[in-house]
Amino acid sequence: MSDHKESTGAIALTLPDRSVRNVAMGSTGYDVALSIGRKLAQDALAIKLNGVVCDLNTLINSDAAIEIITFTSPEGPEIFWHSSSHLMAQAIEELFAGSKFGAGPAIEQGFYYDVSSEHRFREEDLRAIEARMLEISKRDSSVQRQEMSREEAIAFFTSVRNDPYKVEILTETLKNVERVSLYHQGDFTDLCTGPHLPSTGKIKAVLLTNISASYWRGDSNREQMQRIYGITFPSEKLLKEHVARIEEAKRRDHRKLGAELELFLLSPEVGSGLPMWLPKGAIIRSELESFLREEQRKRGYVPVYTPHIGNIELYKRSGHYPYYSDSQFPPLTYHDEDGKQEQYLLKPMNCPHHHLIYSSKMRSYRDLPLRFTEFGTVYRHEQSGELNGLARARGFTQDDSHIYCRPDQLVDEICSAIELTQFVFKTLGFAEVQTRLSLHDPANQAKYGGTAEVWEQAEKDVQEAAERMGVDYFIGIGEASFYGPKIDFIVRDAIGRKWQLGTVQVDYVMPERFDLTYVGSDGQKHRPVVIHRAPFGSMERFIGLLIEHTAGNFPLWLAPVQVAVLPIAEENHDYATTVYRRLLAAGIRAELDTRSEKINRKIRDAEMSKTPCMLVIGQKEQANGEVSLRRHRQGDAGRFATDELIETLKQEIANRQ
């Protein structure tokens, strides 16, 4: 194809490699993919035009930057699985007449749909639904987008579909929207913004995984529904690989390993979603906190501490109360001796408290940047069905930092926050990290604080910082927080799963709401910019991930017990005790096993406990002032003089190995 426009009917499309391809005006994304290669056209799911993800059959009528999205693209699985939820709903509708549908999003691993049906779904129903989904896939029905007015959509879902849930969304959630989009495939129609697959035939492999109870709109006072989960793939091979990963994930489940390794406890007597750290788990958490504190000190952060509750007016002022009201614990109401009522909330966020600390005194431009940091515990009343050990809890601790800086310092400070986050992940063994620039949705500006101009500047600064740091990022429209754009870090664990962890967020909104100022070099008051930054995100969730990523095989510096001292016989106990005490004196976490068990049993138990180092002590070692070292999962590493080995271990720990 020519590299230059040959007629007024041609448009220029810039590909990710910056090459330019000229196509006829009115070409679709599929046409463009086919012009590049037949295999790409077969794999194409959707396109990205000027950073916005669109249907593959979208008509392109002007010059644009274009990217063909496949299943391996960052956006690919979400599109695939969202379309699969529609496919599942169609199958359910065909099998169980009268079923109605609530929400059906893509999730981190697959999708779900909330179903209202007189039929109580069972395991055997899932197999029947799977079979019908594959049957519909073979029909290869095209998926068509239709836009209409909100009033037309209400009439359609009232009289044609008889779907009260979609009518409620249209009349309440979308009451200020003039036009909406519907997607049709065969005889099935759903209300959706899209984008979706071009046809049902793209879905080749289906696995429905489980059924749980849910409530319409997450409100326990509303209708109870049945939530059906599933996952799909464009090939059977990918599904088989996924099933193998699931089996491995079960072996690595942090809830299972947490109990086996005595790391944390979840007790119904304390309450659902409120984990307690056992001594070994507390050591891991303490080491991680010490690691981050040390690195933050090097970068000029200063610690603060804030209460676990706050006056409800504080969170109304920040905007967190209306934004998080559905997931907060009920307010605590008190009356003072004069009868005046005060309401308090369990702290849902640390940010407002830090803003008040900033505003507690006048700040000069010379004071900035000012970097506050806190391991602050916050509380969210997550639905019981969404709780998942440490990964989703009701009480969790954030490694929360807020940087207050001048606008001219902003990009440098974002870069510094990116560098710290990357360093943390590298140290902890996460080699694969994706970066998402989470921007706001201009079509839904009312959802966000601040003006369109403020958002434009904030997003420009975030993008500039990411590019300066050489970050290979992708853009997520609509993924921003309500007060600003953010950089989200998504790590891939040892079995290929993706976890969103650290974040760096820019905020022009809170300085306005809290009237934060500094005195500039001109003697006038100016607004600082705030950066919200949390490499771990949540200590609980991060440690849950770390348990699963390592399968409980923590590196030496992080292991709750670093060394097990294993005397072979009773006559070796005194020397073993001396070695044990020297390890403790050197700051090494050690345990001494003086049970009357055979040495092979002691080694096996230490291996099962995933202790990194085992020191076997018999007559030879005792006579020569030595120890025999075994490394976890590696076996015999040789005999060493005790002093020499202690120094070696201290160095490994200091280097965080």
From Swiss-Prot:
Q: What class of enzyme is it?
A: ligase
Q: Its Enzyme Commission number? A: 6.1.1.3
TGS domain location is 1-70
GO BP terms: namely: threonyl-tRNA aminoacylation
Enzymatic reactions: tRNA(Thr) + L-threonine + ATP = L-threonyl-tRNA(Thr) + AMP + diphosphate + H(+)
Entry note: cofactor:
Binds 1 zinc ion per subunit.
The UniProt keywords, alphabetically, are: Aminoacyl-tRNA synthetase, ATP-binding, Cytoplasm, Ligase, Metal-binding, Nucleotide-binding, Protein biosynthesis, RNA-binding, tRNA-binding, Zinc
Q: Which cofactor does it need?
A: Zn(2+)
Which InterPro entries does the record cross-reference, listed alphabetically? aa-tRNA-synt_IIb (IPR002314), aa-tRNA-synth_II (IPR006195), aa-tRNA-synth_II/BPL/LPL (IPR045864), Anticodon-bd (IPR004154), Anticodon-bd_dom_sf (IPR036621), Beta-grasp_dom_sf (IPR012675), TGS (IPR004095), TGS-like (IPR012676)
Major site of localization recorded for this protein? cytoplasm
GO CC aspect terms:
cytoplasm
Q: Does the keyword Disulfide bond apply?
A: no
Listed binding positions for Zn(2+) are C351, H402, H532
Per the record, which residues fall in region Catalytic?
Answer: 253-555
| Keyword Secreted annotated | no
Query: Which Pfam families has this protein been placed in?
Result: HGTP_anticodon, TGS, tRNA-synt_2b, tRNA_SAD
Localization recorded for this chain is: Cytoplasm
Superkingdom, natural source: Bacteria
Q: Which GO terms describe its molecular function?
A: ATP binding; metal ion binding; threonine-tRNA ligase activity; tRNA binding
HAMAP family xref list: Thr_tRNA_synth
Task: Outline the subunit composition.
Answer: Homodimer.
Functional note: Catalyzes the attachment of threonine to tRNA(Thr) in a two-step reaction: L-threonine is first activated by ATP to form Thr-AMP and then transferred to the acceptor end of tRNA(Thr). Also edits incorrectly charged L-seryl-tRNA(Thr).
Q: What family is this protein classified in?
A: Belongs to the class-II aminoacyl-tRNA synthetase family.
* Protein name (record): Threonine--tRNA ligase
